[in-house]
C-alpha cells in the first residue's frame, strides 16, 4: 500500500500528465484505476479548484443490483456521470497487453462518449498494446522494461 503522501504525489503527477487534454470525467478499469481516479479527483478539487466526476468499469457484468459492468456515481441532479458526448479520460495503473483497459474503452465508446485520452502509470512496453498507444492520446508516467527497469525516465 502507498502512503498518503505518495498517493497525493501520484495524483499530482497524473494531473500534470493530463494537461492539455480536454476531459469531463475520469475513470478506468476496476480495480487498478479506482484509487488513482479518486485521488486525482480529490487533489484536483482541493489544489486546482477543478472538479470532475469519476467512474470505473468492471471486467464482468454484475449479476445483481444494476446488472451492469459500469459503475458511476450519480450527479446531484440524478443524471449519470458518463453519457453520450462526454469526454472521458481513461486512467490505469499498469499497461501490459491492454486487455483490461480495452474493456473500459469499449464501455465508454458504446455509451457514445469520447475517449479524450489514456493515462498509464507504468507502461510495460508490450507490443500487444501498441494499438492503444497509436489510436488514442496516450501518455505514460513511466516506461518499464521486462526486467523492471525504467526506460528513458528523464523523457517522461
For each feature predicted by the language model, list its residue ranges.
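PRPP-associated nucleotide enzymes
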Residues: 1-92, 96-156
